[in-house]
C-alpha cells in the first residue's frame, strides 16, 4: 500500500517540495489531492536525500502547504495504447481532447521508451516518398532516418508539414500499413485548428495520431509531448508492425520549455541559458528513430525547428545537427520570391540517402541526376555572385545559360505548389529535362 504524505514544505511556481520521503524514484508519478478532494498529477523531477521536488502538471493554484495530500504511485508516466489511437487527437500529456472518449488500452507504455540495443538496430534502407521534388530527389527521406527541417520565423514550415502528412507514403508493401504521428508544441489555437482541419479535408485523419500542446498549456506538458508521440509511434511500429513517420513541430518551443523548467529548478545554465544536458535530452528523442531486428515496422522522424534570427549556430539547430542524419533547410530568399516549398537545396543534406535510392529502391539514375542538379545549381550561385560585381551583360554565353537554368530550376523544380504531389519518376524526369538546357 502506497504511503500518503500530508502537507508540503514549499511551493515554487509549478514545483512543490516535500521532505522526509522514502523510496522515491526519479520520474515517478505522483497523485496530489487538494483540500476540496480534486486530484492533480505530477512527477518527481529532483531528489536530494529524503527531499523531493515534484512538478505539478496542472499548476499549483489553490494548493496549500498544510492540507495537500501527496501519494507516490511507484511507476513512471505511462501512455495507454491500442490500435484505437489512430485517428484520435490528444493533448500534450496524452489525454484525448476530441470528445470521442478514453482509449481502451491494450497496454500501458512508459513514455521514456525502452533503450534500443545498438546491435539490434537494422541499417535504414528504402525511402519514404513525400511527393515534394526537392526532398525526394536531393535530400531523400530514408525509412528509419531522423531528418530535421531547419526553418525560420515567417517561413511556411506548418504548410510543409501538412503537405508531407497529406502526401507521404512508403514505397513498398512491407509491414502492415503506414501511419503518421503528428505532435505540435507551443502552437496557437489557430494553428492547431489549421492542422486538424487540413488533415480532415485531405482525408488522411484515419492514419494520423495527433498530439496538440497549445501555447497556453502548462510548460511541463510541452516537455512530455514528444515523448508521448514517440511512445505511440513505437507501439504502432514494433507492436502493430506499421511504418510510422513522426513529425513534430516546433522543437525550439520544446527546448525553450526545457530552459524555463531547468531555470525553475535552479540548475546552472549553459549556452544561451539552455540546460547543460540539452544535447543528451534531444538525443533521447531523436535516437528513438530506427528499425530493429525482428520487427516489420519502423520509426522515421522529421523534427521541425525554427532557428532564432535564422542563426544555424544557435544551440537548438547546432545540437540537432550533431545528432540527426542531415537537414532540410528553408530559405527566406526563396520564400520572398514566391517559391513554395522554399527548400534551399545546397545546405540541405540527407546522410542516409545514398543507401536508400537507386536500383531496387527509386530508379537507377537517381544518384546521377541528383549530383548533376547539385553541381549545376551550385555553379548558378557562383554566377549570381559574379553578376553582382560585373553585371549580367559581361557574362560569358555559358554563364548566361547557367543563369537561365537557375531560374527554370527554381520556378519548375523547387516551386511546385501546395497541392502538387509528384511521383519519384516525375521528379527524376523533370530533373533530366532541366539539365538538358545546359551544354
Residue ranges and their predicted role:
Residues 1-4, 10-130:
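Acidic-enriched and Gly/Ser
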Residues 68-70, 77, 84, 96-146, ...:
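P-loop NTPase nucleotide-binding/switch module
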Residues 138, 221-258:
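Phosphate-binding/switch loop-helix module in NTP-utilizing enzymes
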Residues 140-142, 168-176, 200-205, 235-240, ...:
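Conserved catalytic network of the ASCE P-loop NTPase/AAA+ motor domain
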Residues 146, 177-180, 206-209, 239-245, ...:
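Loop/turn-to-beta-strand initiation segments
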Residues 151-152:
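The Walker A (P-loop) glycine that initiates the GxxxxGKT/S ATP-binding motif of P-loop NTPases
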Residues 155-206:
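Conserved P-loop
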Residues 253, 260-439:
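Conserved catalytic/coupling modules of large nucleotide/cofactor-utilizing molecular machines
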Amino acid at each position: 500500500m502506497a504511503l500518503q504524505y500530508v502537507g508540503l514544505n514549499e511551493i515554487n511556481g509549478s514545483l512543490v517540495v516535500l521532505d522526509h520521503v522514502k523510496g522515491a524514484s526519479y520520474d515517478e508519478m505522483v497523485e496530489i489531492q487538494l483540500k476540496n478532494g480534486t486530484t492533480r498529477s505530477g512527477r518527481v523531477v529532483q531528489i536530494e536525500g529524503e527531499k523531493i521536488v515534484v512538478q505539478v502538471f496542472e499548476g499549483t493554484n489553490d494548493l496549500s502547504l498544510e492540507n495537500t495530500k501527496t501519494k507516490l504511485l511507484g511507476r513512471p508516466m505511462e501512455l495507454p495504447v491500442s490500435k484505437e489511437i489512430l485517428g484520435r487527437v490528444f493533448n500534450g500529456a496524452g489525454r484525448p481532447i476530441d470528445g470521442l472518449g478514453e482509449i481502451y488500452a491494450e497496454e500501458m507504455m512508459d513514455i521514456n521508451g525502452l533503450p534500443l540495443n545498438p546491435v539490434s538496430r537494422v541499417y535504414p534502407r528504402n525511402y519514404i516518398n513525400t511527393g515534394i521534388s526537392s526532398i525526394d530527389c536531393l535530400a531523400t527521406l530514408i525509412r528509419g532516418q531522423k531528418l530535421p527541417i531547419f526553418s525560420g520565423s515567417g517561413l511556411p514550415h506548418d504548410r510543409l508539414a501538412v503537405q508531407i502528412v497529406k502526401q507521404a507514403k512508403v514505397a513498398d508493401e512491407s509491414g502492415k500499413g503506414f501511419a503518421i504521428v503528428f505532435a505540435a508544441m507551443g502552437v496557437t489555437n489557430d494553428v492547431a485548428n489549421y492542422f486538424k482541419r487540413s488533415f480532415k479535408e485531405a482525408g488522411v485523419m484515419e492514419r494520423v495520431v495527433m498530439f496538440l500542446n497549445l501555447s497556453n498549456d502548462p510548460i511541463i506538458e510541452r516537455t512530455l509531448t514528444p515523448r508521448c508521440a514517440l511512445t505511440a509511434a513505437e507501439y504502432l511500429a514494433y507492436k502493430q508492425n506499421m511504418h510510422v513517420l513522426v513529425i513534430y513541430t516546433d522543437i525550439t518551443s520544446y527546448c525553450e520549455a526545457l530552459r524555463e523548467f531547468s531555470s525553475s529548478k535552479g540548475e546552472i545554465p549553459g549556452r544561451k541559458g539552455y540546460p547543460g544536458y540539452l544535447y543528451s535530452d534531444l538525443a533521447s528523442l531523436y535516437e528513438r528513430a530506427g528499425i530493429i531486428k525482428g520487427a516489420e515496422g519502423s520509426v522515421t522522424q522529421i523534427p521541425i525547428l525554427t532557428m532564432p534570427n535564422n542563426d544555424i549556430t544557435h544551440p537548438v539547430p547546432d545540437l540537432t545537427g550533431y545528432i540527426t542524419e542531415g537537414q532540410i533547410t528553408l530559405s527566406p530568399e526563396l520564400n520572398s520570391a514566391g517559391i513554395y516549398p522554399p527548400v534551399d537545396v545546397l545546405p540541405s543534406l540527407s546522410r542516409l540517402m545514398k543507401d536508400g535510392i537507386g536500383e531496387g529502391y527509386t530508379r537507377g539514375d537517381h544518384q546521377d541526376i541528383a549530383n548533376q542538379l547539385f553541381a549545376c545549381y551550385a555553379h548558378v550561385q557562383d554566377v549570381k555572385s559574379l553578376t553582382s560585381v560585373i553585371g549580367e551583360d559581361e557574362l560569358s554565353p555559358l554563364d548566361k545559360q547557367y543563369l537561365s537554368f537557375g531560374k527554370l530550376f527554381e520556378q519548375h523544380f523547387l516551386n511546385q505548389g501546395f497541392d502538387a504531389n509528384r511521383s519519384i519518376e516525375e521528379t527524376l524526369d523533370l530533373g533530366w529535362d532541366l539539365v538538358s538546357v545546359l551544354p
